[in-house]
């Protein structure tokens, strides 16, 4: 059980449909949270947070709280928090489900860039456009994988 927890903490990132950002923390503090919990030193934490903020075009929003961000910006903060630990696998549950079309396309493009950088993505979605861009599609019906 400890080994499974370590693998989840170090190798897997999670992106949820509902962003699960801490309302009292800034975008940068939300992104830094898993690094803080992992005991990463302050200097490295600041550097990695700055890198992911820049890569997701959020540098100008670093000191904003979630309530001050748009839905697309909140989802990008959630993605940044998931990838700041440099996972090999990113699990995404309806990553575009609560977004307008334009923000959804931005998130899809970000996920494709992460995949091109070597992160394996496992997405759960009802979004046909997102599904059509996947390398492999597995359909489920009533909780069962379809042939």
Feature-to-residue mapping (PLM):
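ABC family nucleotide-binding domain
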Residues: 1-140
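Conserved switch/coupling elements of ABC/ABC-like ATPase nucleotide-binding domains
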Residues: 142-147
């Amino acid at each position: 059980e400890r080994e499974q927890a370590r693998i989840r903490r170090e190798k897997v990132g999670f992106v949820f449909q509902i962003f699960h950002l801490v309302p009292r923390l800034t975008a940068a503090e939300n992104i830094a949270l898993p690094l803080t919990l992992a005991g990463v030193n302050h200097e490295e934490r600041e550097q990695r947070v700055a890198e992911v903020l820049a890569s997701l075009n959020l540098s100008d929003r670093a000191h904003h709280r979630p309530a001050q961000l748009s839905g697309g910006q909140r989802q990008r903060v959630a993605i940044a928090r998931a990838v700041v630990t440099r996972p090999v696998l990113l699990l995404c549950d309806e990553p575009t489900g609560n977004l307008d079309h334009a923000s959804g396309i931005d998130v899809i493009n970000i996920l494709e860039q992460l995949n091109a950088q070597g992160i394996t993505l496992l997405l759960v979605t009802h979004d046909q456009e997102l599904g059509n861009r996947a390398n492999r599609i597995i359909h489920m019906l009533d909780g069962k994988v379809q042939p």
